[in-house]
Amino acid sequence: MIKTIVLSMCLAASLLSLNAHAQDVRQYSEGPVTEVNYIQVEYGHFEEYIDWLNSTWKPTMEAFMKAGLIIDYKVFRLTPKSPGQPNVILWITYKNMAGLDKGAEEEEVAKKVICSTECQNKARVGRNEYRKVLGTEYIRELILK
């Protein structure tokens, strides 16, 4: 009888360890990484900013996609809940985290599409008169199994 109880306890313990091992396996895989830029465009300048997005930012993003540097990009309009919050989000999706390390390649593509780095920096200063970059965050898609 004691042998049966001990054997039953050993069997139960081994089943628990199998269940614990199964929980060690990730139930997701890591997907694309998206850079989310929060922008606040001053009142009265929204169309001006959209014109810049269409004339410069969009062709640059298309060139990045053609070069294989990004896999997607989007623009979102938000309704701010309070002052100091963004009203535009620029969304750039990379295949993985390694895609974020391609700054030199992105700069070369941007020079071909827009102009030199110095020229781009001067244009940024001009845009900063009517828009403010509130911050950037990176989010990663988790693909559930």
Spans of features found by a protein language model:
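Short beta-strand/turn micro-motifs at beta-sheet edges
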Residues: 22-27, 77-79
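Short amphipathic alpha-helical segments
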Residues: 45-72
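Short, solvent-exposed loop/turn and secondary-structure capping segments
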Residues: 50, 85-87, 101-105
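Sec/Tat signal peptide C-region and signal peptidase I cleavage site
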Residues: 16-22
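Acidic/histidine-rich, surface-exposed loop or edge segments in extracytoplasmic proteins
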Residues: 29-44
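Charged, often glycine-rich, active-site loop that binds/positions anionic groups
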Residues: 79-92
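Bacterial N-terminal signal peptides that target proteins for export
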Residues: 1-9
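An amphipathic, aromatic/His-enriched active-site/gating alpha helix that lines ligand/cofactor pockets
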Residues: 25-28, 63-71, 91-140
